[in-house]
Structure formats: C-alpha cells, structure tokens
Amino acid sequence: MDLNVELEFIKEPFHIKDMPLKKVYVLDDYLSTTMHHTIDDKITRNAFWGKNNQVNSNSPTGLPHHSFWGAGYFRGHDQTIEHDMEPKKTYLMRWFNRKLQTDFGFMWERFQYFGLNSQTQGLEGTTHADCEPQDDWNLSFLYYPNKFWNDSWGGSLRMYDKMQQGIHGRAEHIKNHQVAEVYFKPNRLLIFDGRIPHGADAPKPAAKYMDRRSLVIRGDEISLKTLWGEDAYD
C-alpha cells in the first residue's frame, strides 16, 4: 500500500465510493453539541475503565510497549458485548456505530472492535496498525469526545511510513518516518486505512491531570452498501 499519506479536511460526511481509502479524512464538529457532551459525560461518569489497553513486548523484563486506560464495548463479527460491560451501557455507542455506517455509506462485514482509550501525561501510544496488510477493505475511525482541549496540551496522532516497536527510539522514528500529524481536537472524527502505522502522543505536562480520550471503531472489512442493503453510491 502507498504510505504517502494525504490529509483532507472535510466539512460533512460523504458516502465512500472506492476502497481502500486513498486519504486520511478529518471532520470537525461531527456531532451536535448535545450529543458530543452526552457521549463525553457517559464515558467519564462510569466505572468500567481498566488498564487494559496494552501492547506487549518481547522484553525480558516483561514490560509492555505501552499500557494505558481503556474500556471495550463490543467486538468481533457478531459485535459481542465485552464480558465485563453492561448491555445498557452499549446503547449509545451502538447508535454511534450505526451513524457512522449511515453517514459514510457502508456496512461492516468483518467488524473488529469498538472501545475507548484514555491517556494522561507520560502514557505515549507506541506505533501500531489496526489490521493485517492483506485487509484492503478495512476501515478505522477515531472520535475525540473531550469537551475542552488546549492546543498547548499536545496529544497529536502521528502517522508513519514504517512500523517501529516500543517507546525506545520513538523520537528518532518521528523525525525520520512521520508522514502526517493530526492535532487532538474535541468533537473531531478521523477516517483512515487502519494499515497505516500510527500512534498517539500523550498529553504534555501542561495538561496536568487532563486525559486525552478517544473512541476507537474499526473493522477488517466493509462493503459499500447501506444498512438497508442498497449500494451506497446509487
């Protein structure tokens, strides 16, 4: 695949007409203020968070590449609810998942995961990809639900032309292999090919105890049909 990433800032959703995606799309103010704030309230006032977003390493110390807070809603082809998640707490996120499919004109054929990430200062996200190289028809979404974020707090999403394992050498990897940077901004939605290596910066010390929150929605394969089974581009 071509890793010369091109960013395109769009003003409204569009029906996808061709796969794999050729660009990384950024859509600001995706949800109404009411829905944006409702989602943030729902995820910050629940006790389902755990230190479960971990990328393991082969280090003899047993230490992971990265480990930060997360929560899973549902995963897999049948979108099975995570074992420690109450069904009623998934309703809003199932609405969000349907909205993405309606707004962008597709259906999940091999759904992978819907969950949350939370990073405070020091919890850098190391480089990873969301799916396997052969999954041409994959799709990844990131949505940023924080109500407020100061630009000086950092938290950029970085995309690369090459994978890199672990936190050691990350600064050099950014210098030599970064191909795109997307700033963290409340109510921002990103749509991209999940095979692109990427990772999110931790908030800077100026953020104090503020955390960088994101909704993660991704699948290994989509079809360009609406939820009613019609061709999305007709």
Could you say what each language-model-derived stretch is?
Residues M1-D2, D234:
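Non-catalytic N-terminal targeting/anchoring module and adjacent flexible stem/linker
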Residues D2-M107:
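Non-heme Fe(II)/2-oxoglutarate
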Residues T90-D234:
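Catalytic core of non-heme Fe(II) oxygenases with the double-stranded beta-helix
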